[in-house]
Regions:
Chain A
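Membrane-interfacial amphipathic/re-entrant helices at transmembrane-helix boundaries
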Residues: 1-19, 47, 59-62, 88-94, ...
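Inter-helical junctions in multi-pass inner-membrane proteins, predominant
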Residues: 1-12, 159-164, 193-231, 256-264
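Interhelical loop and adjacent transmembrane-helix boundary motif
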Residues: 1-5, 47, 51-54, 208-210, ...
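Membrane-embedded helix boundary and interhelical linker motif in transport proteins
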Residues: 7, 29-76, 80, 259
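Short, non-helical or kinked segments that cap or interrupt transmembrane helices
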Residues: 14, 25-45, 59, 89-93, ...
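Alpha-helical transmembrane segments within multi-pass membrane transporters and channels
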Residues: 56-102, 109, 244-249, 253, ...
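Transmembrane helix-bundle core of multi-pass membrane transporters
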Residues: 84-85, 91-162, 189, 255, ...
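Helix-loop-helix "hairpin" substructures at the membrane interface of multi-pass membrane proteins
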Residues: 133, 137-215, 239-245
Length: 293, 380
């Protein structure tokens, strides 16, 4: 039973980490708490579902469609909200409040158009084969989620650490003004970050919709709460932190259910979050005076 | 609100104070708002039954006149509409309201005015304890869940179960309370009780724990939104145990959301579209002809309620005095027995908050069904 719960913790943690990745990127670079990330996540799931239902494509092209749509949404988000607010030097809270508005609008629009009920992917599009090792059941989808979370994060870490774009991103995170003086295309990089973060959110939306096999307008809301917790545990804006924080929260929840009781799940998980903040106010990886992209 | 009432009168061709030889029946249901998916089905059930009664000679030659009002699924509006129907339209009896919540608020108005109020969809505890003018033919979960468990236990031989329920929703929690009581009464052991919250998407940790306690079945109090993924994830974890569900799981949506993982789910219901009783077949065919879609439980219960009230009205000798007629109807109603779309039915007197006899609940056998290859199969 413990072995099965460890697998459960890994796949749930992978889901949280994937969601938190895009969220933390926007915070690290744009310095915005993007509360529309849950809505983007939901749009990704609807886009992939629509691609499968209407155009009868298989899963991989559907994920590509979702990436395209959410990338577009990220572009609009930056052009419509982040860029004008940056230009007018709006206070920190303004973009956050604006993203709440975007989130509510988008969710209502989707609800109005597709209805509020649960939708699901047709059965034949899902990889349903399971791997049985001793008494442990592993779904191939779980394996893919875990591997994809690790790959995406590894890729992002490499880009940020070792590429010139990464260097520019780090400079940008430190000081947009200084970066601009050094010849970094600040507006373009901000836009690119918003697009990439939205694509990450959209793809994780598809994966989670597949994992739970349900798509509904408010699916982003609970994820957003967990995502904020993950990002805070890991350290705001830190990519490694999103990974560790995601698995930390996943395991905390699973082990609480296994050994304490499901009634206490959120109390224990968020109690731990609180204790981490008390001991390390900047999160596991955050370093208060410095910022990392 | 007056405008909307007028609109309904226009739409349904019902005008107040016309010919004297008409029996006025007030209908207050949620026709707009969140509860309208129930209220609209209920209205269709009433209209179908009233139409049939009219075309077979009415009530001893008198016509039925339906005065339909929208109570919007809101307590305040239900009270307003009740007052209008009782004092202005001077109806003989009232059907409605749609939600138990509204019934708690509005039924005392009818009780005080001494007018029969007949609910077809109120399942909460305590509605009929309001007073002796309160009737309902909606069967409560407190009656259905023990029957479901009993049949499931007989057929599958289960002796210990694990319980899984949503702990942040009033409906799934009250359904859990009823399950808990039924499990105690039937002396079925509980290996573990687990919970989840609205909006949860991953239930594998709870299911893994349940699997480790080796139950014979899983009792599940959930709405379909969470219940269907729970069934899918259980099957993915290799858990092939039967599920025993509350009313929240009694929906054809299960077959869409948990397709091919939906087998072996036991649910109880006061009505089933599959029921082969001749009265039900006739109802389903007539409803389909009128509306081009299959009826649901709410339409069936409303349809039966109109016939139950008609049985009582046939016994009345109408006087010129409305108060006397209203009282006579109340006295005639408890004795009515009826076999309709939902099967054999009679009333049972409930006790009030003061311990004295009060209103009347439904006595009806629950239909227990199990899912098999994406449909419900009735179990005897």
């Amino acid at each position: 039973m413990l072995a099965q719960q460890i697998i459960n913790g890994l796949s749930l943690g992978g889901v949280y980490a994937l969601f938190a990745l895009g969220f933390t990127l926007v915070f690290g670079v744009l310095n915005v708490i993007n509360l529309a990330h849950g809505a983007i996540f939901m749009i990704g799931a609807y886009a992939a579902l629509h691609a499968v239902l209407v155009f009868h494509v298989s899963l991989l092209p559907a994920i590509f469609v979702a990436a395209l749509v959410t990338g577009g949404a990220g572009w609009i988000l930056d052009k419509l909200i982040f860029a004008p607010l940056r230009a007018s030097r709006a206070p920190h809270l303004a973009p956050m409040i604006a993203t709440i508005g975007v989130s509510i609008c988008v969710t209502s629009l989707i609800e109005g158009y597709f209805g509020s009920e649960n939708l699901r992917f047709p059965l034949d599009t899902l990889p349903s084969s399971t791997l049985t090792l001793a008494s442990v059941q592993v779904n191939w989808l779980d394996v893919k989620i875990i591997v994809l979370a690790l790959l995406l994060m590894g890729g992002m870490l490499w880009v940020i650490r070792h590429s010139s774009t990464g260097r520019a991103l780090r400079a940008l995170a430190e000081s947009p003004k200084a970066a601009a003086l050094l010849g970094v295309n600040v507006g373009g990089l901000f836009l690119a970050t918003s697009v990439i973060a939205s694509i990450l959110g959209g793809v994780s939306g598809v994966l989670i919709a597949l994992y739970t096999n349900s798509v509904f307008p408010h699916m982003g809301q609970p994820m957003l709460h967990k995502g904020i917790a993950v990002v805070i545990i890991g350290g705001m804006g830190d990519v490694r932190g999103a990974l560790i924080g995601g698995f930390f929260l996943g395991f905390a929840e699973v082990l609480t259910i296994a050994y304490i009781g499901s009634n206490m799940r959120d109390a224990v998980a968020f109690g731990l979050l609180f204790s981490v903040l008390l001991l390390r106010p900047a999160g596991l990886f955050g370093q208060a005076p410095q910022r990392r992209a | 609100m007056r405008c909307r009432a007028l609109l309904f009168i226009l739409v349904f061709g019902v005008l107040p104070n016309t010919a004297a030889a008409q029996i006025k029946i007030g209908i207050a249901e949620a026709l707009t708002g969140n509860a309208s998916q129930y209220g609209v089905a209920i209205r269709k059930g009433f209209e179908l039954a009233a139409g049939e009664i009219a075309s077979s000679g009415g009530i001893n030659g008198q016509k039925l006149e339906l005065v339909i009002e929208d109570e919007q699924g809101k307590k305040e509006e239900a009270i307003n509409v009740f007052k209008k129907l009782i004092f202005q339209d001077k109806v003989l009896l009232l059907f409605g309201p749609t939600l138990s919540n509204s019934a708690q608020a509005a039924d005392p108005v009818a009780q005080a005015a001494k007018v029969v109020v007949f609910g077809t969809s109120n399942t909460a505890d305590g509605i009929t304890s309001i007073g002796n003018y309160v009737f309902r033919n909606s069967v409560t979960e407190a009656d259905i869940l023990p029957a479901t468990l009993k049949v499931a236990a007989q057929k599958t031989g289960l002796s210990k179960v694990a319980v899984l329920y949503g702990n942040d929703d009033i409906f799934t929690r009250s359904s859990y309370d009823n399950f808990k009581k039924a499990l105690q009464d039937l002396k079925i052991g509980v290996t573990t009780t687990e919970t989840f919250a609205k909006g949860d998407v991953d239930f594998k940790p709870q299911l893994t724990k349940i699997k480790g306690t080796n139950p014979d079945a899983i009792v599940l109090s959930a709405l379909v939104a969470e219940g269907a993924p729970i069934m899918v994830q259980a099957r993915q974890l290799g858990i092939t145990l039967p599920f025993v569900g509350g009313n929240g799981m009694n929906s054809p949506r299960v077959f869409e959301l948990a397709r091919d993982h939906s087998d072996n789910l036991w649910v109880g219901s006061p009505w089933s579209v599959e029921s082969s009783a001749p009265e039900n077949k006739r109802f389903v065919a007539a409803y389909q002809k009128a509306h081009g879609a299959l009826p649901d439980q709410f339409a069936a219960q409303a349809y039966d309620a109109m016939y139950i009230a008609a049985q009582a009205m046939r016994k009345l000798k109408f006087a010129a005095n409305l108060d006397a007629d209203r009282r006579a109807l109340r006295d005639a109603l408890p004795a009515v027995q009826w076999s309709g779309a939902t099967g054999p039915f009679k009333f049972r007197q409930a006790t009030g908050r003061d311990g004295k006899p009060a209103g009347y609940d439904a006595v009806q056998t629950a239909i227990v069904m199990v899912t098999k290859r994406n449909q419900y199969v009735i179990q005897k």
